[in-house]
Amino acid sequence: MPRENHVAKQRRIGERLSRAMVKAHMDRRELAALTGYSEAQIALWEHGRAPLYPAELIKLCHTLDVLPEWLLCWERRLY
């Protein structure tokens, strides 16, 4: 299986962030208010145009009630 490039991975993370926001019934404004990040920064993450650092990841996951592994698109591989 070919490895996914960095840009494609960031886009997938952004898609999952958007899905988590919908599931939590939260828009960018609400997420920004709860996390302290700007709406513009959240939009960059959603569109895969900015990296998500560990502290940001943890805060977003806690706020949206999702696992970091899910948001990062990690897949468990069974051998």
Segments the model singles out, each with a brief description of its role:
Residues 23-47:
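Short alpha-helical DNA-recognition segment
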Residues 15, 19, 33, 44, ...:
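DNA-binding alpha-helical recognition surfaces that contact promoter or target DNA
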Residues 55-70:
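DNA major-groove recognition helix of helix-turn-helix/homeodomain DNA-binding modules
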